[in-house]
Amino acid sequence: MGLPWYRVHTVVLNDPGRLLSVHIMHTALVAGWAGSMALYELAVFDPSDPVLDPMWRQGMFVIPFMTRLGITNSWGGWNITGGTITNPGLWSYEGVAGAHIVFSGLCFLAAIWHWVYWDLEIFCDERTGKPSLDLPKIFGIHLFLSGVACFGFGAFHVTGLYGPGIWVSDPYGLTGKVQPVNPAWGVEGFDPFVPGGIASHHIAAGTLGILAGLFHLSVRPPQRLYKGLRMGNIETVLSSSIAAVFFAAFVVAGTMWYGSATTPIELFGPTRYQWDQGYFQQEIYRRVSAGLAENQSLSDAWSKIPEKLAFYDYIGNNPAKGGLFRAGSMDNGDGIAVGWLGHPVFRNKEGRELFVRRMPTFFETFPVVLVDGDGIVRADVPFRRAESKYSVEQVGVTVEFYGGELNGVSYSDPATVKKYARRAQLGEIFELDRATLKSDGVFRSSPRGWFTFGHASFALLFFFGHIWHGARTLFRDVFAGIDPDLDAQVEFGAFQKLGDPTTKRQAV
């Protein structure tokens, strides 16, 4: 039968064996992609500098997901935190990738088997001898099994009872490591940034899923509900499954973009809101102030700031700075970070400390403006020199570095001062290597941005798919143009499965 491309899925209508086959093949493709992508990323990943060139700067997409579940070692002899290891064990990055590829191959073979041997006794209704599926019972089985998996993940893997735990870090992404997590059963478990909520919610949701699965296995739906929701139609299953998937996609798009315990910044990069709110800048200033309160010099206080913390406070790591259609990793944009030059402190000729106004997220260019502690503009880099009153030359601005590679170095010549003022707009100043990757200097987004964009886009698409298939299954008789109580042959829409005379609509 000459099916148009958009109707090819009708071949698995009323064919449970081949419906199962195509789903197994889909699982094979997903697992095969995951394993292959992991091997590709491992081939190009450079683990040598986890501070200034972490996985998210290199555009790694699947490695962060493996890492947050407890995989940290490679058969290449390296650890994700920068150390070396001698016995990575089976469950290394390569081991997980290989397991996915082996699983993919087995699913591929199983899909072929089920395609060839499609007419199995298990799919036949013993009363009619025709293929049929007990969809409410299948729903109960799936709910029960997914509940067991959910409960097992929360109770064993996350807690470390049987498993490694998950990636846990401090609020500033400095001390992250894989460790067991105790369930948080109090109100704190509802805080999206508390790792204990991951364990407790999986245990609770898994328990609910197990109980709900047993309920649906032991209780039949009422006839009115069964007919009203078209529970005997496979397209109802499709519609409700799409609903579950698009809802999950919207949720994870949110937890990724806004940040949560499930998306640590060490693995996925910072969020845009941490730049917008000066999150890392405030912590850096708090640490410097604490150092000064302990009678440390300004130089010593800034020298104690971890390079990792300073690097987060750089606009090039903001996922909202990269355009959605700029291909490549962050390293392909502004370059590979080599070192922190230090914190520049600007002063005018009266000795008043000046602060460069930082570039907001959605600006490509921004005027260089220096304000004092009260927010009053004291200096700038003017667009029109003839009308300038606050130029660096007129105000006599100097810059001195504290911490980093230029610790203790000061500059007073206007050209150099303006250069560092422009760079200070972008947060802490880093030396960036653009030669190695031929980086073009245009900011890129991090995997956090790609994941969010992809999942939000597909969630919207799947939302419309849910509406489409839900409407089709609920109003099938209307769309087919057939009175459900009519069993006479009708030309238009007579066959549920196109070209198949065995599926002529019967009166119920």
UniProtKB/Swiss-Prot annotation:
<comment type="similarity">
    <text>Belongs to the PsbB/PsbC family. PsbB subfamily.</text>
</comment>
<dbReference type="InterPro" id="IPR036001">
    <property type="entry name" value="PS_II_antenna-like_sf"/>
</dbReference>
<dbReference type="GO" id="GO:0009523">
    <property type="term" value="C:photosystem II"/>
</dbReference>
<dbReference type="GO" id="GO:0016168">
    <property type="term" value="F:chlorophyll binding"/>
</dbReference>
<dbReference type="GO" id="GO:0045156">
    <property type="term" value="F:electron transporter, transferring electrons within the cyclic electron transport pathway of photosynthesis activity"/>
</dbReference>
<feature type="transmembrane region" description="Helical">
    <location>
        <begin position="237"/>
        <end position="252"/>
    </location>
</feature>
<dbReference type="InterPro" id="IPR017486">
    <property type="entry name" value="PSII_PsbB"/>
</dbReference>
<dbReference type="InterPro" id="IPR000932">
    <property type="entry name" value="PS_antenna-like"/>
</dbReference>
<feature type="transmembrane region" description="Helical">
    <location>
        <begin position="101"/>
        <end position="115"/>
    </location>
</feature>
<keyword id="KW-0602">Photosynthesis</keyword>
<dbReference type="GO" id="GO:0009772">
    <property type="term" value="P:photosynthetic electron transport in photosystem II"/>
</dbReference>
<keyword id="KW-1133">Transmembrane helix</keyword>
<feature type="transmembrane region" description="Helical">
    <location>
        <begin position="140"/>
        <end position="156"/>
    </location>
</feature>
<feature type="transmembrane region" description="Helical">
    <location>
        <begin position="457"/>
        <end position="472"/>
    </location>
</feature>
<keyword id="KW-0934">Plastid</keyword>
<keyword id="KW-0148">Chlorophyll</keyword>
<dbReference type="Pfam" id="PF00421">
    <property type="entry name" value="PSII"/>
</dbReference>
<feature type="transmembrane region" description="Helical">
    <location>
        <begin position="21"/>
        <end position="36"/>
    </location>
</feature>
<dbReference type="GO" id="GO:0009535">
    <property type="term" value="C:chloroplast thylakoid membrane"/>
</dbReference>
<keyword id="KW-0157">Chromophore</keyword>
<comment type="subunit">
    <text>PSII is composed of 1 copy each of membrane proteins PsbA, PsbB, PsbC, PsbD, PsbE, PsbF, PsbH, PsbI, PsbJ, PsbK, PsbL, PsbM, PsbT, PsbX, PsbY, PsbZ, Psb30/Ycf12, at least 3 peripheral proteins of the oxygen-evolving complex and a large number of cofactors. It forms dimeric complexes.</text>
</comment>
<keyword id="KW-0812">Transmembrane</keyword>
<feature type="transmembrane region" description="Helical">
    <location>
        <begin position="203"/>
        <end position="218"/>
    </location>
</feature>
<comment type="function">
    <text>One of the components of the core complex of photosystem II (PSII). It binds chlorophyll and helps catalyze the primary light-induced photochemical processes of PSII. PSII is a light-driven water:plastoquinone oxidoreductase, using light energy to abstract electrons from H(2)O, generating O(2) and a proton gradient subsequently used for ATP formation.</text>
</comment>
<keyword id="KW-0604">Photosystem II</keyword>
<protein>
    <recommendedName>
        <fullName>Photosystem II CP47 reaction center protein</fullName>
    </recommendedName>
</protein>
<keyword id="KW-0793">Thylakoid</keyword>
<keyword id="KW-0472">Membrane</keyword>
<keyword id="KW-0150">Chloroplast</keyword>
